[in-house]
Swiss-Prot record:
<dbReference type="InterPro" id="IPR012678">
    <property type="entry name" value="Ribosomal_uL23/eL15/eS24_sf"/>
</dbReference>
<dbReference type="GO" id="GO:0006412">
    <property type="term" value="P:translation"/>
</dbReference>
<dbReference type="GO" id="GO:1990904">
    <property type="term" value="C:ribonucleoprotein complex"/>
</dbReference>
<comment type="subunit">
    <text>Part of the 50S ribosomal subunit. Contacts protein L29, and trigger factor when it is bound to the ribosome.</text>
</comment>
<keyword id="KW-0689">Ribosomal protein</keyword>
<comment type="function">
    <text>One of the early assembly proteins it binds 23S rRNA. One of the proteins that surrounds the polypeptide exit tunnel on the outside of the ribosome. Forms the main docking site for trigger factor binding to the ribosome.</text>
</comment>
<dbReference type="GO" id="GO:0019843">
    <property type="term" value="F:rRNA binding"/>
</dbReference>
<dbReference type="GO" id="GO:0005840">
    <property type="term" value="C:ribosome"/>
</dbReference>
<keyword id="KW-0694">RNA-binding</keyword>
<dbReference type="InterPro" id="IPR012677">
    <property type="entry name" value="Nucleotide-bd_a/b_plait_sf"/>
</dbReference>
<dbReference type="GO" id="GO:0003735">
    <property type="term" value="F:structural constituent of ribosome"/>
</dbReference>
<dbReference type="Pfam" id="PF00276">
    <property type="entry name" value="Ribosomal_L23"/>
</dbReference>
<keyword id="KW-0687">Ribonucleoprotein</keyword>
<comment type="similarity">
    <text>Belongs to the universal ribosomal protein uL23 family.</text>
</comment>
<protein>
    <recommendedName>
        <fullName>Large ribosomal subunit protein uL23</fullName>
    </recommendedName>
</protein>
<keyword id="KW-0699">rRNA-binding</keyword>
<dbReference type="InterPro" id="IPR013025">
    <property type="entry name" value="Ribosomal_uL23-like"/>
</dbReference>
Length: 105
């Protein structure tokens, strides 16, 4: 699998925002390819950001039922989420606003 196709995009929710700011280790969350393992995610992260993560945790989200106007329920997409834990003191700019703020300094 190509390293550029492992990490699809950042995953930002209220929960991930609170996880990121809760501890001394910065935790980043990404949606990754469903077939990617932790070693591939680590290599892709190093290739993209140039930083070595401390730890990587993954979880698979099942499709959830959603209401539709018909009698048959719809489903959300299944996804694999990677939680990338960085060493103490290492900051990574993931969002567009963070990159612009880092460039302004």
């Amino acid at each position: 699998m190509e390293l550029t196709r492992v990490i699809l995009h950042p995953y930002t929710t209220e929960k991930t925002y609170s996880i990121r700011n809760k501890s001394e280790h910065e935790t980043l969350t990404f949606i990754v390819d469903k077939n990617a393992n932790k070693y591939q995610i680590r290599e892709a992260f190093i290739a993209i950001f140039g930083l070595k993560p401390l730890k990587i945790r993954t979880t698979n989200r099942r499709p959830a039922k959603i209401r539709t106007s018909t009698a048959r329920p719809g489903y959300t997409k299944a996804k694999k989420i990677a939680y990338v834990v960085m060493p103490v003191g290492v900051k990574v700019a993931v969002s567009k606003e963070e990159v612009e703020a880092a460039n302004a300094k």
